[in-house]
Amino acid sequence: MPVSLTPNAITAIHDGDVNLKPLLQVLEIKMIGRSQERSQERYRFLISDGVSAQHAMVAVQLNDRVKSGQFEKGSIVQLIDYICSDVKGRKLIVVLNMETIVQQSETIGNPTIFGETDTEAQKTFSGTGNIPPPNRVVFNEPMVQHSVNRAPPRGVNIQNQANNTPSFRPSVQPSYQPPASYRNHGPIMKNEAPARVIPIAALNPYQGRWAIKARVTAKGDIRRYNNAKGDGKVFSFDLLDYDGGEIRVTCFNALVDRFYDVTEVGKVYLISKGSLKPAQKNFNHLKNEWEIFLESTSTVELCPDEDGSIPKQQFSFRPISDIENAENNTILDVIGVVTSVNPSVPILRKNGMETHRRILNLKDESGKAVEVTLWGEFCNRDGRQLEEMVDSAFHPVLAIKAGKVSDFSGKSVGTISSTQLFINPDFPEAHKLRTWFDYGGKDTASFSISRDTMPGGVSRNEIRKNVSQIKEEGLGRSDKPDWITVKATISFIKTDSFCYTACPLMIGDKQCNKKVTRSGTNRWLCDRCNQESDECDYRYLLQVQIQDHTGLTWITAFQETGEEIMGCPAKKLYAMKYELEKEEEFAEIVRDRLFHQYMLKLKIKEESYGDEQRVKMTVVKVDKVNYTSESKYMLDLLVR
């Protein structure tokens, strides 16, 4: 069947027609190498409609098809998706998707470069020898995968449109048009038509006007910052469109107030009039080289009548075995069956702020397991639900979107602000894992790539000792402190000096906390700050006796661990005993804390007191015993 090139296609594209789906011939293919501005190679085609020819840049997602020979000099192709941008006064066609109709053909017609003068037009050619290259244009297209399965027809005769024989009819692909809710909605500037809706993959900084239709898949909290310009606030949300393209949108200051409550995860929006800037890959894990920054003229409009064609979420799951070779700080998606969940524990950050941490373990069909660390609200919201499920002997499937790889003491995955957790999700990967686990996977041995976890969630780096071993093995008497974990019961708490008066003044963003004394003016004096205060703080300095089946010893618990043991602030107990003089109530609180068993992580170090050397044991972490995890740990010891 003869095939004809689409007449006047180059002219139509220059005039803004992006829905034509024309048949054109490839006259030249040239690879443009990498440079400092480009992160990867690009290809430039010379395409012709038989009369006019025009250079076109090919999006990087088509690189593999160019390298495999699907497109070559002389090929007849159909442009499926493309844009025409104005760059420095020159028109630039960017081909986002195309298909080969005929693999090879002689040059059709006598084409000339579009827009040349009559004199230049006399320089017709057969091939591309006399075609001057356009000005160099540099930009990067985001990497997006497109699947094209149609094989090109074979043995097709090719001719120019001047021949009256029947012509091949191009296939019609769905075009991107503004939805009905967008047309005639809101104020539009005079002589300004609504921007054409394009795929996220087609976005680049060289476009004047654009619009995208996409679903919000994730939304961050409002973050506040302070820099040389003053205080500010920012939030971001992630978008996913019909073609699987993803991009992050960021708003600052007044735009936070304008758009934060407007955007909602799961809803579809029409977004236009933002600026594109290079994505900050330290904070942005999406597979897109650009990021949208909304401006005062930007619009974000809800599409209430969306048809569900845009997926709810997009995953790119990695098997746990692959995570073992992933680089530190890699952002990835992982799915597995939860085998254990540890209790949530408070953690003091370097800035003095407290957060929570919860550790769980995942396994999958790859024969590997990995430790997952939940931080902050993930501990309470999702972590508690997972813990209840596992404690009731049900092991849920957990999908993690945008987890961060850590290589500290083996490989593990942790949550970040943009992480999303999906418990027992309804998609094929989850159903497959569920079936695998229920029909044999549960009893299949899995090697942990975290290396610091053992059955029951116990740390491999955790050194378990009993009380008698501390003295017998001379722990703490070397140059470096020893760190051990003891399962012991609190048998006695000294109450004569259970706390000390602490400095409440701030040094930077941290409280001083050094001991203060009464001055001559009856105020509190801090030698470190060299300042006086009207009030002081009260912080724990608990002397606690612990014992197990091998013996007993004394340990010291400071503020955070002291509060964990006593269950209330030191200031409350001080006021009860010394100010309110409620001795019996105070004694009852202390008695209530005795004879409870804990997992105590201790720092053991020899220190000098005058001329005497003493081994001091300080509590750095207090956990209630998780009997489910502890039973698994003890069973593992028996097996070994």
UniProtKB/Swiss-Prot annotation:
Q: Which residues bind DNA?
A: 211-293
Q: Does the keyword Metal-binding apply?
A: yes
Q: What does this protein do?
A: Component of the replication protein A complex (RPA) required for DNA recombination, repair and replication. The activity of RPA is mediated by single-stranded DNA binding and protein interactions. Plays an essential role at later stages of meiotic recombination events required for the formation of class I crossovers. Is essential for normal progression through meiosis in pollen mother cells. Is involved in repair of double-strand DNA breaks (DSBs) induced by genotoxic stresses, but does not seem to be required for the repair of meiotic DSBs.
Can you tell me which family this protein belongs to? Belongs to the replication factor A protein 1 family.
**Zinc finger residue ranges, C4-type:** 503-529
Expression across tissues is: Expressed in roots, leaves, stalks and flower buds.
Effect of disrupting the coding gene: There are differing accounts of the mutant phenotypes. According to an early study with a limited number of progeny from different sources, it is embryonic lethal when homozygous. However, a more recent study describes homozygous lines that show normal vegetative growth, but reduced fertility and meiotic defects.
Predominant subcellular localization, coarse grouping:
nucleus
Does the entry feature the keyword Cytoplasm, yes or no?
no
Keywords of this entry: DNA damage, DNA recombination, DNA repair, DNA replication, DNA-binding, Metal-binding, Nucleus, Zinc, Zinc-finger
Query: Know the name of this protein?
Result: Replication protein A 70 kDa DNA-binding subunit A
Give the UniProt record's GO annotations in the biological process aspect: chiasma assembly; DNA repair; DNA replication; male gamete generation; male meiosis I; pollen development; reciprocal meiotic recombination
Q: Which organism is it from?
A: Arabidopsis thaliana
Record note on quaternary structure: Heterotrimer of RPA1, RPA2 and RPA3 (canonical replication protein A complex). Interacts with RPA2A.
- What's a Gene Ontology MF term here? DNA binding
Cell location? Nucleus
List, alphabetically, the InterPro entries matched. Answer: Euk_RPA1_DBD_C, NA-bd_OB-fold, NA-bd_OB_tRNA, Rep_factor-A_C, Rep_factor-A_N, REPA_OB_2, Rfa1
Cellular component, GO annotation: chromatin; nucleus
Induction per UniProt is:
By the genotoxic agents methyl methanesulfonate (MMS) and bleomycin.
From the broadest rank down, the organism's phylogenetic lineage runs: Eukaryota, Viridiplantae, Streptophyta, Embryophyta, Tracheophyta
Q: Which Gene3D superfamilies match?
A: Nucleic acid-binding proteins
